[in-house]
């Protein structure tokens, strides 16, 4: 059976979803993952952002955890996460998160967070404590962090890097021209500066970024974004189709890219020297994150600059 991925989302009026944007119904360990997540009391971006890969990933016991609450201080016109005054930070969240990772027996975990512009350190310290808790309880588990930009504050980025995540992921999200309109509280150049700063602070740490397509960008603009990421020595790139969370509050889908077009974008990105590139309709920042991480680490160990 097939399940249309936008069962809780909208898409442009009069525009039918392409055949490749269909997914099988959940199976395997889906129910087990649901149970562990619900009992732990931790949030996942899989649910909050209405990710189309939820069924597939949860069936494989893959989950991306979202810390620092489920309310964001920023409003981006592509994101399904609620914008509101955030709740106080839960001090026991790092341990609850680590317990969930242990129960799910994850070999690689992705932690993301809402933007917390209301906090003095924008949540960097709490983020670092979550990484430390997971490493303490699950020493064999590798940790990938996907934070907001911290306004590119070096002390915040440094605090998180010092916790020792194996991979630092920060998304560029879209091409530069579209950023002011669709991501008004973010800045394209600031996101590049975040990745540059990570490389300066932790030269051996893998870095990663993601770009959405279908918002009205041109191919040359995408190529420029990929080149900009390589200029700050970004190691890993993900490229995926933007899907409109709601009809009335989010930017419309301007184009559904074909699998062939994703292959072409991926080929161009690989020609620039990324260690790993994932490009496809369902690709998201954390999609197949464990496999992408292992591929990147293996290639990094074989390169001149050993990041192992």
Name each model-derived stretch.
Residues 1-64, 68, 95-99, 105, ...:
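Auxiliary Fe-S-binding modules of radical SAM enzymes
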Residues 73, 175-176, 244, 284:
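Alpha-helix N-cap/helix-start and coil->helix boundary motif
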Residues 75, 119, 178, 247, ...:
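Glycine/Thr-rich phosphate-binding loops of Rossmann-like dinucleotide-binding domains
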Residues 56-59, 77, 81-84:
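Short functional micro-motifs and their immediate structural scaffolds
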Residues 51, 72, 76-79:
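Short cysteine clusters
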Residues 80-97, 103-194, 208, 236-238:
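Core AdoMet radical
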């Amino acid at each position: 059976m097939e399940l249309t991925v936008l069962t809780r989302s909208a898409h442009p009026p009069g525009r039918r979803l392409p055949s490749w944007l269909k997914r099988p119904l959940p199976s395997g360990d889906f129910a087990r993952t649901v149970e562990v997540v619900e009992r732990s009391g931790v949030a996942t971006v899989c649910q909050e952002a209405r990710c189309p890969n939820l069924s597939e990933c949860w069936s494989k016991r893959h989950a991306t955890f979202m810390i620092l609450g489920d309310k964001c201080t920023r409003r981006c016109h592509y994101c399904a996460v609620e914008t509101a005054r955030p709740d106080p930070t839960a001090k026991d969240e790092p341990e609850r998160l680590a317990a969930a990772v242990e129960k799910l027996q994850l070999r690689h975990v992705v932690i993301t967070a809402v933007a917390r512009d209301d906090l003095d350190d924008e949540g960097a310290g709490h983020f670092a404590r979550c990484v430390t808790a997971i490493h303490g309880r699950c020493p064999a588990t590798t940790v990938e962090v996907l934070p907001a930009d911290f306004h590119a504050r070096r002390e915040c980025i440094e605090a998180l890097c010092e916790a020792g995540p194996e991979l630092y992921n920060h998304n560029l999200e879209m091409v530069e021209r579209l950023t002011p309109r669709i991501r008004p509280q973010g800045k394209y150049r600031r996101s590049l500066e975040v990745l540059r700063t990570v490389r300066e602070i932790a030269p051996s740490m893998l870095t990663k970024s993601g770009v959405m397509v279908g918002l009205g960008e041109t191919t040359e603009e995408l190529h420029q974004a990929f080149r900009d990421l390589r200029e700050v020595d970004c190691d890993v790139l993900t490229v995926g189709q933007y899907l409109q969370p709601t009809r009335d509050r989010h930017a419309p889908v301007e184009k559904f890219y074909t699998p062939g077009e994703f292959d072409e974008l991926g080929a161009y990105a690989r020609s620039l020297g990324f260690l790993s590139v994932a490009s496809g309709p369902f690709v998201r920042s954390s999609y197949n994150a464990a496999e992408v991480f292992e591929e990147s680490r293996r290639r990094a160990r074989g390169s001149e600059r050993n990041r192992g």
